[in-house]
């Protein structure tokens, strides 16, 4: 019965990968705040100069 130890090795490896990816997701930069016209910059008028403003 060589299957059971192999299964446990795979199971522990998979759980450690899940644990590592969960920790990394916390360190991602938070979502940047969107200003007017869904733009990341505060003054984005020059980028949207051809779009009529409401």
Curated annotation (Swiss-Prot):
Residues 1-25 form the signal peptide. It is found in: Secreted; Secreted, Extracellular space. GO terms for cellular component: extracellular region; extracellular space. GO terms for molecular function: apelin receptor binding; hormone activity. It comes from the Eukaryota. Pfam families: Toddler. One of its GO terms (biological process) is regulation of blood pressure. Keywords: Angiogenesis, Developmental protein, Differentiation, Gastrulation, Hormone, Secreted, Signal. Interacts with APLNR. Peptide hormone that functions as endogenous ligand for the G-protein-coupled apelin receptor (APLNR/APJ), that plays a role in the regulation of normal cardiovascular function and fluid homeostasis. Functions as a balanced agonist activating both G(i) protein pathway and beta-arrestin pathway of APLNR. Downstream G proteins activation, apelin can inhibit cAMP production and activate key intracellular effectors such as ERKs. On the other hand, APLNR activation induces beta-arrestin recruitment to the membrane leading to desensitization and internalization of the receptor. Belongs to the Elabela/Toddler family. This is Apelin receptor early endogenous ligand. It comes from Rattus norvegicus (Rat). The gene is Apela.
């Amino acid at each position: 019965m060589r299957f059971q130890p192999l299964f446990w090795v795979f199971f522990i490896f998979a759980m450690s990968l899940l644990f590592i990816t969960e920790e990394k997701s916390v360190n991602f930069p938070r979502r940047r705040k969107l200003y007017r016209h869904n733009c990341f910059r505060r003054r984005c008028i020059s980028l949207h100069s051809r779009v009529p403003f409401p």
